[in-house]
A protein has these predicted regions:
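N-terminal leader/targeting pre-sequences
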Residues: 4-53, 58-158
């Protein structure tokens, strides 16, 4: 009668974005999202980057059609705050840690972002995820001086 007691709980809702190369880059990859414990879990696997750090943000609009990804608009900012460090209180909801690409141009990220969800007013579904050419300095306004947008993916529910 207790056979199911140790079963892994069913996974909750999730979403993902397939990255499209933009601004002449060769970037590709996938970013996955799930909710757990009131935080948004983000997993990314990216290739085709230059080695080093790259700005990594959720943007307002789920539109990656522009060649430079400008159609994604600015950082998702449901609380109306200034741009800042992803771990700080004063930041855009869409501010995430820089991706670190290895010598082969590959980056992986796994972490939790507070203040965001899959749906609702703080929801990421229907928005976009963008990778930038340069690192986010976590202070310059409005976007961390992270350079051109080299990859963009629309976040869709799985």
């Amino acid at each position: 009668a207790l056979l199911g007691a140790c079963a892994t709980p069913a996974s909750g809702p999730s979403a993902s974005a397939d990255l499209l190369a933009r601004s002449g880059s060769a970037v590709s990859g996938k970013v996955s999202f799930s909710e757990a414990g009131g935080k948004l879990r983000v997993e990314a696997q990216v290739a085709g980057l230059t080695p080093g750090e790259h700005g990594f943000h959720i943007h307002e609009v789920g539109d990656c059609s522009a060649p430079d990804a400008s159609s994604a608009k600015g950082h998702f900012n449901p609380a109306g705050k200034a741009h800042g460090h992803h771990a700080g209180m004063e930041r855009h909801g869409g501010d995430m840690p820089n991706l670190l690409a290895n010598a082969a141009g590959e980056a992986r990220f796994s972490g939790e972002i507070s203040g965001l969800s899959l749906g609702g007013a703080t929801g990421v579904v229907g928005r976009s995820v963008v990778i930038h050419a340069d690192p986010d300095d976590y202070k310059s306004q409005p976007a961390g001086n992270s350079g051109k947008r080299i990859a963009c993916g629309v976040i869709v529910a799985d």
